[in-house]
Regions:
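Conserved core of the sugar-phosphate nucleotidyltransferase
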Residues: 124-248, 268
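A conserved hydrophobic position in a structured secondary element of the catalytic/binding core
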Residues: 63, 115, 186, 208, ...
Length: 305
């Protein structure tokens, strides 16, 4: 059995939600450090969710240094080796590559699950049961990377969509298929068509063996992979901060969905996830619709009305 590891991506700036999060905190902190729904921050909700299946001692959290005042208490709570501080936010691809290389150095046979830190699930236990199944599937087919796709309830135009190929593995509750292609923020007409033909919302949660994930990134972004691999000897040494700062000053912003997943569908499978009350809280209207679905009265809803 392979070691289970997790990466929580918490380095984004969350600018699209700042007008709303400012109502809660009085400042411009990124949404992952804000109690948008419920009494704890989205990041802490994600940490608790992940801990249902993966040990906290094997969970890396990727942050950005300019947000340090917002994760100060976290830095005091967890071992320093589990908090990966990027010099600046350069997008999801560098954050993921950096974290995977750190894990590979510790546990080269690890199965890694990648989690955004700003999503909401009404049923954490049900969702994490799908993670358990995905991990088991990846152990059987270690060369593949598994995305978790959410069964859509509306023709959402602000989400990414996954178009699956016909099912090759199925059970009564779970369905696993290969990925055909991705659709990013489709028109309403296209989203309606995607929904009618069984396409899925892309949760951006994915599971893979660390070597398979790194192989996929290397194939899609060889120059960036080489740049991060070149400074790997500095990881967890006194030189890491300087090496990262120099590297991040040279690389361009890079989006993992667009520049890795979209160009490597042949490496990917998708697991169909049913109704777990999922929402990507990237836009104010999604927060308000989630609050309405939960029947929650809040200052956010009142201020928007």
């Amino acid at each position: 059995m392979r070691d289970r590891w997790a990466v929580i991506l918490a380095g984004g700036d969350g600018t699209r939600l700042q007008s709303m999060t400012r109502t809660i905190t009085g400042d411009n902190r990124p949404k992952q450090f804000v109690p948008v729904i419920g009494g704890s921050t989205l990041l802490n909700q994600t940490r608790r969710r992940v801990a249902l299946s993966i040990e906290s001692s094997r969970t890396l959290i990727v942050v950005t240094q300019k947000h340090q005042r917002f994760y100060k208490s976290l830095a005091e709570e967890i071992p320093r080796s589990l908090l990966l501080e990027q010099p600046v936010n350069k997008g999801t691809a560098p954050a993921i590559l950096y974290s995977l290389l750190r894990i590979a150095a510790k546990s080269p046979r690890a199965v890694v699950t990648l989690f955004p830190s700003d999503h909401f699930f009404a049923d954490d236990e049900e969702f994490m049961s799908h993670i358990d199944v995905a991990i088991d599937a990846v152990e059987v087919q270690p060369e593949t990377v598994m995305l978790l796709g959410i069964t859509p309830t509306t023709p959402e135009t602000e989400y990414g969509w996954i178009e699956p190929q016909p099912s090759i593995l199925a059970s009564v509750q779970k369905s696993i298929t290969r990925v055909s292609k991705f659709w990013e923020k489709p028109s309403l007409t296209l989203a309606t068509s995607l929904m009618s033909r069984g396409c899925l919302w892309n949760s951006f949660v994915m599971v893979g063996c660390v070597d398979a994930l790194l192989k996929m990134i290397r194939a899609a972004m060889p120059e960036m992979y080489a740049a991060f691999a070149a400074i790997a000897p500095a990881y967890e040494t006194a030189n890491e901060h300087k090496a990262l700062a120099e590297l991040y000053s040279q690389i361009e912003d890079a989006n993992f969905s667009h520049q890795v997943l979209a160009v490597r569908p042949e490496d990917l499978m998708v697991m169909r996830v049913g109704d777990v009350g999922w929402s990507d809280l990237g836009e104010p209207n999604r927060v308000l619709s989630t609050l309405a679905r939960l029947g929650v009265q809040s200052e956010l809803a009142m201020s928007a009305s």
